């Protein structure tokens, strides 16, 4: 017998939360994935707009896309977590290490932003989402080490989930990276991922460094995953991601539970990055005290003044996770600020 891993209750609430968010922010499209952090099972996977063969107006070909596995997107700052993970795992930086986040140039390209100046530790770099800090961390890592760690996390690799039309994404390890490539990759430009790949990578952080095979079939036995990160690395990352939500992404908070995650906002590429269209991300883990689910929310091209991941994707994450944890019977944490 074949039993799907999809939990219809979580699937339904994810559909409703994503649909409401797409309408509220007048977005072109969106997707959400919920993974069981311990097994790699897909608990929910939803897309907007979604197809309905019974309604003529909802039969458009693009409505049948499973965006979570077919769409390859630059993840923006959500990738900074993986940059920090690589540096910690390979002993290049320690959690308490500081980095000069003052904007700097590579050739004619200025790397930096107005959020960061001076020496900051790794947690603060994630909280403030410092491009210059992430870039300098990345440039201290040898290319082969960076590629090897990211590949172990599933970046640039087919997840073999069983969903048709799955894209591989693009990491580009076959190239001889120039410094500008490695710098921009650190904050999620020049690399493309699917939502499912991003969820898989973060699941290693949630699962004490073990990467499991993604499955749409309900798993009967405990999976034998492969180690990508050490337990000490993931313990530090979980604390950092919780601090990100606590200090800079209040819309991602879930009442009664400790959660962690990272936003991402990336300009869409046409001929260049000069346009006004953006993709907004939030990738989160819950509960931080004993991780059980990893959730990725992507909102494509929201319209209006709100287009950052923390503004549009984070509240959708909060809505999905709030319901999912209760459906799964996961007890709330005590003394949690909401």
Language model: regions and residue ranges:
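Small/polar-residue-rich segments within soluble enzyme cores
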Residues: 1, 296-297, 315-318
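Short, gly/Ser/Thr-rich active-site loops of penicillin-recognizing serine hydrolases
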Residues: 222-225, 314-338
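Conserved, well-ordered alpha-helix/loop/beta-strand core segments that scaffold catalytic motifs
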Residues: 1-30
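A helicase ATPase "motif cassette" and its flanking acidic/Ser/Thr-rich regulatory loops
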Residues: 14, 125, 317
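Short, charged, low-complexity patches
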Residues: 7, 11, 198, 309-321
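Short, intrinsically disordered, mixed-charge
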Residues: 19, 23, 242-246, 322, ...
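Beta-lactam-recognizing serine transpeptidase/beta-lactamase-like catalytic domain environment
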Residues: 6, 32-77, 82-303, 309, ...
């Amino acid at each position: 017998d074949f039993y799907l891993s999809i939990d219809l209750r979580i699937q339904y609430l994810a559909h409703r939360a994503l649909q409401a968010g797409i309408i509220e922010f007048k977005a072109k499209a969106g997707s959400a994935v919920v993974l069981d952090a311990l097994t790699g099972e897909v608990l929910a996977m939803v897309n907007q707009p979604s197809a309905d063969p019974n309604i003529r107006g909802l039969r458009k070909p693009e409505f049948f896309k499973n965006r979570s596995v077919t769409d390859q997107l630059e993840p923006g700052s959500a990738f900074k977590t993986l940059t920090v993970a690589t540096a910690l795992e390979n002993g290049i930086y320690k959690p308490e290490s500081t980095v000069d986040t003052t904007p700097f140039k590579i050739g004619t390209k200025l790397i930096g932003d107005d959020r960061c100046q001076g020496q900051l530790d790794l947690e603060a770099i994630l909280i403030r989402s410092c491009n210059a800090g992430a870039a300098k961390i990345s440039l201290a890592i040898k290319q082969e080490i960076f590629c090897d760690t990211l590949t172990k996390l599933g970046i640039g690799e087919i997840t073999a989930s069983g969903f048709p039309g799955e894209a591989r994404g693009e990491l580009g390890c076959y190239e001889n990276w120039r410094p500008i490539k490695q710098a921009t990759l650190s904050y999620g430009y020049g690399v493309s991922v699917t939502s499912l790949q991003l969820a898989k990578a973060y699941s290693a952080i949630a699962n004490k460094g073990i990467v499991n095979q993604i499955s749409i079939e309900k798993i009967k036995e405990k999976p034998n995953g492969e180690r990508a990160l050490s337990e000490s690395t993931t313990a530090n990352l979980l604390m950092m991601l919780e601090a990100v939500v606590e200090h800079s992404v209040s819309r991602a908070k879930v009442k009664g539970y400790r959660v962690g995650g990272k936003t991402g906002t990336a300009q869409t590429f046409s001929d260049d990055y000069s346009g006004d269209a953006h993709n907004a991300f939030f990738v989160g883990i819950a509960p931080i005290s004993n991780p059980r689910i990893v959730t990725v929310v992507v909102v494509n091209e929201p319209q209006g003044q709100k287009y950052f991941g923390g503004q549009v994707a984070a509240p959708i994450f909060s809505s999905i996770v709030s319901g999912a944890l209760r459906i799964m019977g996961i007890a709330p944490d005590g003394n949690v600020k909401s």
